[in-house]
Regions:
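Active-site/ligand-binding surface loops and adjacent short beta/alpha elements
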Residues: 121-174
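Sec-dependent N-terminal signal peptides
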Residues: 5-13
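C-terminal segment of classical bacterial N-terminal signal peptides
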Residues: 14-19
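Acidic, serine/threonine-rich low-complexity disordered tracts
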Residues: 21-124, 161-255
Length: 255
């Protein structure tokens, strides 16, 4: 299994950023929450993930939210070690991203060691993203549509802003520093069995996308939210060319 592809798919479904004119804590979309997930393959845990929605920040006359994702390896020993972190800072009103920070730290017995920090700065006024990797002199400029999301701000928009009960398709342009994707998430209401809640009514968002690591073969991303007004993201499934993996919700904590 290619862990890198699993990680890319996870951050598609789903470090503080400093502002030069100062910042302060402001009210976010309710108390901050941390969602903890486990991904298993053949019943064995392979990845642990935590997804945290932070209360907003305020600076330069605007309010912002932050979403943080941490993904680590589970019980893989010397075969593979991962401790990757991702942070998205976005405008509170629209969830349009301001910055997306990737901190990659992983290595394995048969994998190349990767340790780098990359910052994506979104500039919707000029329809571009500036990509800067720590230690590199060059700053890449990538042209994107005005309303382009990173993977975490996409997740936040679905969680905080979208009316999933309308069952309308959600169309988004997403850029993660690797490639620009046009994705359509199709909602569907259904009952599912969950680890911590039992059987619940849920809304499933489903989108098809291609994966460069599999010769651009298509895979499917599914996210289930509880259909109870809270929209708790209880399950994420990756249907990849190499098979399916599920990230199930284990626990929710207040931050």
């Amino acid at each position: 299994m290619r862990i890198r592809v699993l990680l890319l798919a996870l951050i598609l479904i789903g470090a503080s950023v400093a502002y030069p004119h100062g910042q302060r804590s402001v009210s976010g979309p309710g108390p901050g929450k941390i969602f903890f997930y486990t991904a298993k393959k053949f019943g064995v845990p392979i990845l642990k993930a935590s997804l945290q929605f932070e209360n907003g920040l305020s600076g330069q006359g605007k309010s912002f939210y932050q979403v943080r994702l941490q993904v680590s390896s589970a019980a893989l020993g010397v075969l593979f070690r991962m401790n990757n972190r991702f942070t998205s800072t976005m405008e509170a009103e629209t969830c349009v991203p301001v910055q997306y920070v990737k901190e990659i730290d992983q290595e394995g017995l048969f994998k190349e060691k990767k340790n780098y920090l990359e910052t994506l700065t979104f500039d919707p006024n000029h329809q571009r993203v500036l990509v800067e990797k720590k230690g590199d002199q060059e700053i890449r400029e990538v042209s994107v549509p005005a309303e382009t999301f990173d993977p975490l701000s996409m997740f936040a928009r679905c969680y905080l802003k979208e009316d999933l009960s309308s069952h309308r398709d959600i169309r988004m342009t997403i850029y993660d520093g690797l490639r620009l994707r046009q994705m359509v998430f199709q909602p569907k209401q259904e009952k599912i069995k969950t680890r911590i809640y039992g059987e619940v009514e849920a809304v499933r968002l489903e989108a098809t996308t291609s994966f460069a690591s599999f010769e651009n073969k298509e895979g499917v991303i599914r996210i289930w939210y509880t259909d109870d007004g809270k929209k708790t993201p209880i399950l994420m499934e990756l249907d990849l060319p190499i098979g399916s993996v599920r990230f199930e919700l284990d626990e929710i904590r207040e931050s």
